[in-house]
Structure formats: C-alpha cells, structure tokens
Swiss-Prot record:
This is MOB-like protein phocein. The gene is MOB4. SMART domains: Mob1_phocein. Keywords: Cytoplasm, Golgi apparatus, Membrane, Metal-binding, Transport, Zinc. One of its GO terms (molecular function) is protein-macromolecule adaptor activity. Part of the core of STRIPAK complexes composed of PP2A catalytic and scaffolding subunits, the striatins (PP2A regulatory subunits), the striatin-associated proteins MOB4, STRIP1 and STRIP2, PDCD10 and members of the STE20 kinases, such as STK24 and STK26. Part of the striatin-interacting phosphatase and kinase (STRIPAK) complexes. STRIPAK complexes have critical roles in protein (de)phosphorylation and are regulators of multiple signaling pathways including Hippo, MAPK, nuclear receptor and cytoskeleton remodeling. Different types of STRIPAK complexes are involved in a variety of biological processes such as cell growth, differentiation, apoptosis, metabolism and immune regulation. Zn(2+) 1 binds at residues 92, 97, 169, 174.
Length: 223
C-alpha cells in the first residue's frame, strides 16, 4: 500500500473489506505506535508477519512493562483460542465429550458455576473463555492497559491454567482439529513458551508434548 506523503494511514478493516485485503497497511515500529493499544497492535503485527517466529513474538520492546506485556499476550491467546473453540464445535458435542478431560488422570471442574462442577467439554471451553474475557476486561482489576498493579498481574496464572485445558482436551480427544489449527497458528507452541518464559504454569501441568517435540527436533537437526 503506497500512501502520499503526509497522508494518515487508517489502520482499520473497513466494513465490507474482503478477507484477502485484511490488515493491508504498512507495518509500524513500536515507537511509532502512539495509542493505548500499542502493545496489542505490536503483538498482532508480529503474529501476522510470521506466526511461527515465536521468539520474535514473545520478545518485548525495550523498556516495556512486563505486567502489561503478559496481560496483552493473554488477551491475544484468548482471542485466538476462540478460533479453536469454533472448530471444536464440529465434533466436541455434549453427548460425546460429557466431561472436560485430557488424559484419564484428571476431570476438570468448571469454575463458572457458583459451586465448581463438571461440564461437557464444549461448555467448559465456552465458559472458560467467557470467564477469562470478563476478568481481562474488568475495570476493577485491569482499569488501564498502560500500567497494571502487581496484585492484578498475579491473577494471570490462574487464567493460563484454565485456558490451557482447552489445548489439552483438543490434543488428546480431537487430535486432527488440534493439529490443523496448530499448523496454521502455532498457538499451543507459543502459549507453552510464553508460560514457561514467565513462570505462569508448572512444567508438570504442560501435558501436550510440545516441549518434547522441540527437544527431539533440535537433536535430529544436529545429527
């Protein structure tokens, strides 16, 4: 897209824009982004450029507040997980996936109810993403997207643990859908590296074998 000198670039998909023309505007450096949504825009720009370049996507700009950086990444993970949830609806039905499970070792209770209880997996997925959206959009805990209190940042770990169960259920029970979406987005790879980088989850709870795959690939690549 070539713009005349001095002409402002509208960084917005207008109503009626065709899918192939989405985001058809020049990239900006982080320093040029002057809105309160700059961190979100920067993350999304890097994802669009190359979603497989996870190290680049997770590398914060110099001087970036770490709490805001983690918060904006978690918002982005929830946005993209909605895409996986839509695909799961084609075969993850309440009568076939009656509980939210991954391996046979655990049955996850849904925290969306007054008293946590079992939910069909697809309902658990919807409830979890809705609950995460409510928390991350809460003016009580996250009134600003420029600075975040440490007490609010501490809540991000519990959100990570809950939404990770969507990945694990998809991997162990809907592998074809998981693989297709992962090949398109590298979302579980990115999430796994993200929570490990910022110690938001215990390695023991990361049961989708992303880390093992990377070790195997690095070993085979060095042979």
């Amino acid at each position: 897209m070539v713009m005349a000198e001095g002409t402002a670039v509208l960084r917005r998909n207008r109503p009626g824009t065709k899918a192939q023309d989405f985001y058809n505007w020049p990239d900006e450096s982080f320093e040029e982004m002057d809105s309160t949504l700059a961190v979100q825009q920067y993350i999304q720009q890097n994802i669009r450029a190359d979603c497989s370049n996870i190290d680049k996507i997770l590398e914060p700009p110099e001087g970036q507040d770490e709490g805001v950086w983690k918060y904006e990444h978690l918002r982005q993970f929830c946005l993209e997980l909605n895409g996986l949830a839509v695909k799961l609806q084609s075969e993850c039905h309440p009568d076939t996936c009656t509980q939210m499970t991954a391996t046979e070792q655990w049955i996850f209770l849904c925290a969306a109810h007054k008293t946590p209880k079992e939910c069909p997996a697809i309902d658990y997925t919807r409830h979890t993403l809705d609950g995460a959206a409510c928390l991350l959009n809460s003016n009580k805990y996250f009134p600003s997207r420029v600075s975040i209190k440490e007490s609010s940042v501490a809540k991000l770990g519990s959100v990570c643990r809950r939404i990770y169960r969507i990945f694990s259920h998809a991997y162990f029970h809907h592998r074809q859908i998981f693989d297709e979406y992962e090949n398109e987005t590298f979302l579980c790879h990115r999430f796994t590296k993200f929570v490990m980088k910022y110690n938001l989850m215990s390695k023991d709870n990361l049961i989708v074998p992303i880390l093992e795959e990377e070790v195997q690939n690095s070993v085979s690549g060095g042979e």
